[in-house]
């Protein structure tokens, strides 16, 4: 009799997990449930699957509300009905129009009203009025009793008990942003919205058997056939499966000849073998759609990187989906697709951050808005945010909330309500709070997506489904990962800047040629990789130096072992040790030497686990991948795992291996599989790193300008500006006659973009550039103020940063002139149209001189950093006993160094103490790294940006010098002479 059950996907309303509802219902003797979250369809299949597991009949519905007002409950009679309900919710979300007060005509649904939009006698055959149990006694005096065929039991389920009711009320307050004392009864559920013992509702409504019968009729006449199947995905690209295979074969074979030459037997055999598996598993359309997306991107000049396990496929390489040669790197196709793999294949396609939306728009237009949507993610209540939300709802002052957040164990300091916060915070922890957009997952369906979910329009203009990637996997949808990154943006922009600044058209797509360039390899080996994608961090630069990395294969390995899991396991250090001392280890078995020789016997990659399992024990590659996947997940107790484990040891015994050897190899497989990384993924990143390195090597100024303009790198803008200077650029502050909105370059001079002036309005910055491009340079401050509508305050920002230095006047003289020429009431026009313009009266100024360092202090205030050498601002002339380039000459010695703070990394030791790895630059601009162990860090902590004098011992780690800090002190700047 329960036709209105809510889960916590009735956001900030429900309190049940979807799986709990059928489990609890079963305990109450209920055999059918209608699952109807409020304006949400996230957990529909989750609920259906849970019901089937419990032997409960699942029925799907949606409770439609507008601005918290209950409009009607829609119940799907079948899958077509579910599509109708999802479509109704979708149309409202996409159009932005409110839901209709009266439900539209629906052919396959039941509609239940609480507040009738028309006379009961006008209700359609499938429309009813819902009567709550507590309203039964009022029926005898209501005209509704005359229409018994139009009444049903309406007993919502929202929580399990009174604690659940209280949690519900707190959720409602969070939703409405009010304190608990202001919560109105109409804004929350009634305390009676719980499951009742079997027979309770029938007893309440026993005087009205028609109502019971009507309700049972609805339950009996509804069913759902929702199933998980790969057929939900778009099945063909061309419209016919056979034509898909023909097209894919044609593209793959011609691509193979283009990539490898006409007579590369091994490449062609692998291509044909992969095509056979792709066809058998029904993935032709998946490959062709991915190819189509990449083809479109290339047609409009966008760069891309294909990565993930998809780069294990030679067909993907032949189709230009990836630029990783699987033959060169011995990559196994079975890591990507094999008949034993239950999860769908996965291509990760990266585009520049400023191109991705256009590619996404193409996909929606090409494959249809009813069939295309982005995946959702669930932002959940968690951690400190729960305490803050509940603290506000309970009316606690911010100071009391801060105390609870900062000192959760200090019970004696807590507000008395803290115990309620912890109690109910634990109850709502991990409840979804709101839906947002997945990083890049896109679904393309065969039937309209509304058969499974409603769609919700997001601020970016694209709709999302209501479920996340795990919900998609449960339904066996294949997602297309269309992702964005800044690295591709700076590569593309650098190519454009080289063309613009030097008139050279360069090709960065011939990665094979770039990988063999001796100058690029030397740049890699030096570790001078600031700005280069994935390899610019202090840790990575140090690793490259330690490994003397100068080729693609070693960079692929370095990109893997730098990851936290490998480093923390100790295998990164073992890898470096074996690289430097090849005689210090022996291979466990000849198979290790044959197949892990390039990584010195260390299982760096997921593919390495597959290789050892396959070549050592004889499990086929499909089984090896299944075993690898189980070991990296949480299914080590599964039947499949035990079967493969038993087969591994049986095969080893048949091959005559000693038991001790078999067990040790198994132990290593188990331990390595937990942190190993996809080799194809690393290879894709390494290829992009080489493109960045090529540009940094041959066109460093254009490259660094592009890095500055794409933001989001490892370092701050200040550091990239510094690196550009180190590469030979002359750095100029923003200028109204030379700067554009973004940073630009003329020859070897880089002008900081107007975007970097923190206080300058974006609209004004664009107007300054556009006016100059149309009518030419500004001729004077007066000319500028007559052509640009600018406030006095904004004009002062420009004067202070030096944007009018070309006038020959200093900032004080310009400030005086500003008072004479700035008039906010004038009509702002190009000076050539001002026929009767008059010059301001001549006046004599006193000598207005700038102090020595005030420009630097203005730059710090307005840009966030000085454009001069920050060491010039120090009170002391001391620059350290040694500089960065001298550190190797002072190994083991205690020295003083003076450095300008660049960044630091927090690390927790095995004992739980905090330590830092720091990076600084010396007076000459060269990097040096510092190590701050817990005692040192506790006594001498970093105090923000600026220069520090550090005392410590110079140590060496595989040829990479750093300073173990014992003492540190921040050095004061000279005083700003104006204050």
What are these regions (language model features)?
Residues 11, 64-77, 157-178, 343, ...:
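Short alpha-helix plus adjacent loop in nuclease-associated cores
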Residues 4, 37, 58, 78, ...:
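Divalent metal-coordination and catalytic microenvironments
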Residues 57-62, 159-164, 172-218, 335-376, ...:
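Phosphate/diphosphate-binding loops
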Residues 32-35, 51, 191-192, 242-979:
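Noncatalytic, beta-rich nucleic-acid-contacting surfaces in large DNA/RNA-processing enzymes
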Residues 203-246, 511-513:
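A short helix-loop
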Residues 41-42, 65-68, 158-161, 311-313, ...:
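Short gly/pro/ser/thr-enriched loop/turn and capping motifs at secondary-structure boundaries
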Residues 36-38, 60-64, 76, 153-157, ...:
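Glycine-rich, histidine-containing beta strand-loop boundary motifs that form or position
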Residues 1-35, 39-54, 87-169, 203-210, ...:
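Domain-core and long-helix interface of multi-subunit machines
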């Amino acid at each position: 009799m329960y036709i209105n059950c809510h889960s916590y996907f009735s956001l900030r309303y429900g309190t049940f997990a979807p799986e709990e509802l059928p489990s609890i219902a079963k305990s109450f003797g209920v055999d059918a449930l209608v699952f109807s979250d409020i304006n949400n369809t996230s957990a529909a299949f989750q609920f259906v699957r849970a019901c089937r597991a419990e032997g409960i009949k699942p029925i799907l519905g949606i409770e439609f509300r507008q601005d918290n007002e209950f409009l009607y409950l829609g119940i799907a009679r079948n899958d077509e009905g579910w599509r109708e309900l999802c479509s109704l919710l979708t149309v409202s979300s996409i159009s932005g129009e409110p839901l209709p007060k009266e439900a539209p005509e629906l052919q396959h649904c039941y509609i239940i009203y609480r507040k009738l939009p028309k006379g009961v006698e006008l209700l359609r055959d499938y429309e009813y009025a819902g009567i709550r149990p507590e309203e039964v006694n009022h029926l005898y005096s209501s005209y509704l009793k005359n229409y018994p065929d139009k009444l049903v039991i309406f007993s919502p389920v929202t929580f399990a008990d009174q604690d659940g009711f209280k949690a519900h009320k707190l959720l409602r307050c969070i939703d409405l942003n009010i304190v608990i004392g202001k919560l109105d009864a109409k804004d929350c559920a009634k305390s009676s919205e719980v499951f009742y013992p079997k027979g309770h509702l029938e007893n309440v409504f026993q005087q009205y058997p028609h109502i019971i019968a009507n309700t049972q009729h609805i339950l009996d006449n509804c069913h759902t056939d929702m199933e998980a199947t790969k057929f939900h995905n778009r099945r063909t690209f061309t419209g016919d499966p056979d034509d898909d295979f023909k097209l894919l074969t044609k593209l793959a074979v011609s691509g193979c000849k283009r990539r490898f030459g006409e007579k590369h037997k091994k490449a062609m055999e692998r291509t044909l073998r992969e095509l056979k598996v792709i066809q058998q598993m029904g993935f032709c359309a998946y490959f062709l759609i991915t190819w189509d997306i990449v083809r479109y991107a290339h047609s409009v000049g966008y760069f891309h990187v294909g990565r993930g396990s998809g780069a294990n496929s030679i067909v993907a390489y032949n189709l230009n989906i990836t630029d990783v040669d699987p033959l060169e790197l011995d990559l196994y196709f079975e890591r990507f697709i094999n008949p034993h793999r239950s999860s769908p294949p996965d291509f990760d396609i990266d585009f520049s951050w400023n191109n991705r939306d256009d590619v996404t728009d193409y996909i929606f237009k090409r494959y249809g808005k009813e069939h295309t949507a982005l995946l959702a993610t669930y932002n959940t209540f968690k951690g400190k945010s729960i305490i803050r939300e509940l603290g506000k709802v309970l009316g606690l002052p911010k100071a009391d909330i801060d105390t609870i957040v900062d000192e959760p164990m200090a019970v004696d300091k807590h507000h008395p309500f803290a115990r309620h916060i912890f109690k109910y915070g634990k109850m709502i922890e991990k409840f979804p709070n709101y839906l947002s957009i997945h990083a890049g997952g896109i679904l393309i369906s065969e039937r309209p997506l509304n058969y499974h979910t409603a769609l919700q329009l997001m601020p970016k203009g694209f709709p999302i489904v209501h479920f996340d990637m795990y919900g998609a996997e449960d339904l066996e949808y294949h997602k297309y990962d269309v992702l964005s990154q800044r690295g591709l943006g700076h590569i593309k922009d650098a190519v454009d800047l080289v063309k613009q600044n030097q008139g050279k058209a360069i090709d960065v797509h011939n990665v094979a040629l770039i990988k063999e360039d001796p100058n690029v390899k030397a740049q890699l080996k030096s570790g001078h990789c600031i700005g280069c994608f994935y390899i610019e961090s202090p840790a990575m630069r140090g690793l490259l130096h330690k490994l003397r990395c100068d080729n693609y294969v070693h960079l692929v390995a370095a990109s893997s072992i730098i990851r936290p899991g490998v480093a923390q396991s100790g295998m990164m250090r073992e890898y470096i040790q074996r690289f430097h001392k090849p005689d210090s280890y022996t291979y466990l078995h000849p198979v290790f030497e044959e197949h892990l020789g390039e990584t010195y016997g260390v299982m760096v990659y997921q593919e390495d686990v597959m290789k050892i399992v396959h070549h050592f024990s004889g499990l086929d590659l499909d089984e090896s991948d299944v075993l690898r996947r189980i070991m990296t997940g949480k299914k080590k107790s599964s039947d499949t795992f035990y079967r493969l484990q038993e087969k591994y040891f049986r095969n080893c015994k048949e091959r005559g291996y000693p038991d001790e050897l078999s067990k040790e190899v198994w132990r290593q497989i188990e331990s390595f599989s937990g942190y190993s990384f996809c080799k194809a993924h690393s290879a894709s990143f390494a290829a992009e790193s080489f493109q960045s390195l090529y540009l940094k090597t041959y066109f460093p100024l254009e490259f660094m300008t592009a890095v500055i303009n794409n933001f989001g790198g490892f370092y701050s803008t200040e550091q990239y500006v510094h690196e550009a200077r180190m590469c030979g650029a002359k750095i100029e502050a923003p200028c109204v006659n030379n700067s554009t909105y973004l940073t630009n370059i003329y020859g070897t001079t880089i002008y900081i973009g107007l975007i970097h002036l923190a206080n300058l309005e974006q609209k004004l910055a664009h107007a300054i550039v556009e006016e100059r491009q149309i009518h030419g340079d500004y001729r004077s401050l007066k000319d500028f103020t007559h052509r640009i509508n600018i406030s006095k305050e904004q004009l002062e920002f420009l004067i202070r940063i030096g944007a009018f230095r070309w006038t020959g006047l200093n900032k004080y003289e310009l400030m005086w002139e500003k008072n004479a020429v700035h008039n906010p009431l004038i009509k702002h026009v190009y000076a050539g149209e001002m026929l009767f313009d008059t010059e301001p009266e001549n006046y004599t100024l006193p000598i207005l001189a700038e102090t020595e360092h005030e420009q630097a202090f203005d730059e710090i205030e307005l840009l966030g950093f000085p454009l001069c050498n920050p060491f010039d601002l120090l009170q002391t002339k001391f620059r350290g006993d040694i500089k960065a380039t001298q550190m190797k000459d002072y190994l083991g010695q205690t020295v003083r160094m003076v450095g300008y703070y660049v960044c630091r990394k927090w690390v927790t030791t095995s004992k739980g103490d905090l330590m830092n790895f720091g990076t600084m630059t010396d007076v000459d601009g060269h990097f040096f790294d510092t190590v701050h162990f817990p005692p040192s860090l506790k006594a001498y902590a970093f105090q923000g940006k600026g220069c520090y004098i550090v005392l410590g011992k110079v140590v060496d780690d595989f040829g990479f010098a750093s300073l173990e800090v014992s003492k540190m002190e921040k050095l004061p700047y000279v005083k700003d002479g104006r204050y």
